[in-house]
């Protein structure tokens, strides 16, 4: 492992001193290592990134999401040094950075392949790659009016309801927006997709888990303005068509996970149960 990328979120508190220390830690483990620095994911999606052995992300979970989308086509593994708020995906804290880099070069890690989503807009030429690691969300526009949606799974009608929107999430995204919409926490290596309605106007409409190979069609039956498509909470596009198709992408996000990290501990402390009675012994 000699070609290392570092993707920096310039909105975070990352001083030159921090970066110099990271350079030092890397060269202590491999004096011949070549390091390429990226800022705010610019240039990460270029073909040259295919040569990288790993990318370290200095930022928060949002920076991880952007990095994952940029590198998805190149099969480059990533891990995050948390400089954000939550740090669920970017799970390495700054004080543990040296240890993580040492373990990286010693090969003391595993790689988790995480499902990603793709989205096609019916009747529109594919000019953009709508890839998502967390979720793809179709919602009403700015008006405070609900929209009527009809959901088809593998071309079979599932249900129709009125709601503020619809979330289609991966297992990775199950701890994000869909969790707030009442969806379950899904273990990250499961091959499933989740549909979670946002504020449905019916008590009987609940989130559902589907086979990961399912094709999900969302048809907008009644609208007062063009709905909005949001990718990982970061990319935003007004939708002028009445049907959106969401399915599993052929690309995956490759997350580097170090052996001393426990998913359930991270879940307890950062997502699920922030109370003394659940801290354990």
Curated annotation (Swiss-Prot):
InterPro entries: ATP-NAD_kinase_N, ATP-NAD_kinase_PpnK-typ_C, NAD/diacylglycerol_kinase_sf, NADK. It comes from the Bacteria. It catalyses: NAD(+) + ATP = ADP + NADP(+) + H(+). Its EC number is 2.7.1.23. Transmembrane segments: none annotated. GO terms for cellular component: cytoplasm. Keywords: ATP-binding, Cytoplasm, Kinase, NAD, NADP, Nucleotide-binding, Transferase. It is found in: Cytoplasm. This is NAD kinase. It comes from Clostridium botulinum (strain ATCC 19397 / Type A). The lineage of its organism: Bacteria, Bacillati, Bacillota, Clostridia, Eubacteriales.
